[in-house]
Amino acid sequence: MKKDDSLKKIKYKVAAFYNFISILDEEILLIKEELTNLATNQKIKGTILLASEGVNGTICGTENAIVQFIETLEKLLKVSDINVKYSWSEKQAFRRFKARKKKEIVTIGLKEINPTKSVGKYIKAGEWNQFLEDPNSVVIDTRNEYEIKIGNFAGALNPQTSSFREFPAWVQKHLKPLIEENPSLKIGMYCTGGIRCEKASSYLIEEGFSDVHHLEAVSYTHLTLPTKA
């Protein structure tokens, strides 16, 4: 088989994206309608969640269609730097397109948490291992138990949650006492895609934690990098 033959089979581009940004209710309805019309015309499939705190979604379509969709979304949100990751698929990854208005784009269950106002400090991928090796740091995996079993950074705290809603209770029971005993510890968090640890950092800041960091837009591929024992 020629080298290019395998590439010809890959017809579809997948985009996983999110952005914490304040959106008015009336704007949500307009954005939902325009994106739904575009997805229908371009035969894009997937799911998008829209809320007053931003947008979160995963879609699949031809490369040109996905490029047009992301450009349209950025225009509607009035941003130029939406958090998006791309991958490829030999077939359409989803059955239909759904755009939904929700209370949260990632559910933690606390109305007062607002990542559009405050989040932790970003850690670049190239600086992550240095943070892991810092004896004055504590690292938290904000993913659920199922995801953690697939792979994680050695030494990271596992909250043992089945859903993100359980994270605040774990913080109150386990993390708060730890930081009270060791107030100089820096907190670092990671997840898949970046959305959960970004919102988790907003929650920690709201709870009074000061030295809060999170890995910028981590993916499963990053989990293969060296970890501390």
Regions found by a protein language model. Name each.
Residues 3-24:
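Short glycine-/aliphatic-rich beta-strand segments at the starts of folded cytosolic domains
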Residues 19-21, 57-61:
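Short beta-strand-to-loop capping motifs
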Residues 25-42:
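Short amphipathic alpha-helix segments
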Residues 50-55:
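Short Gly/Ser/Thr- and Asp/Glu-enriched loop/turn motifs at secondary-structure junctions
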Residues 57, 172-218:
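Catalytic cysteine-centered active loop of the rhodanese-like fold, especially the PTP/DSP P-loop
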Residues 63-112:
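Extended, charged alpha/beta regions that create polyanion-binding interfaces
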Residues 105-183:
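Positively charged, proline/Ser/Thr-rich regional signature most characteristic
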Residues 222-229:
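Single conserved hydrophobic/aromatic residue that forms the stacking wall/gate
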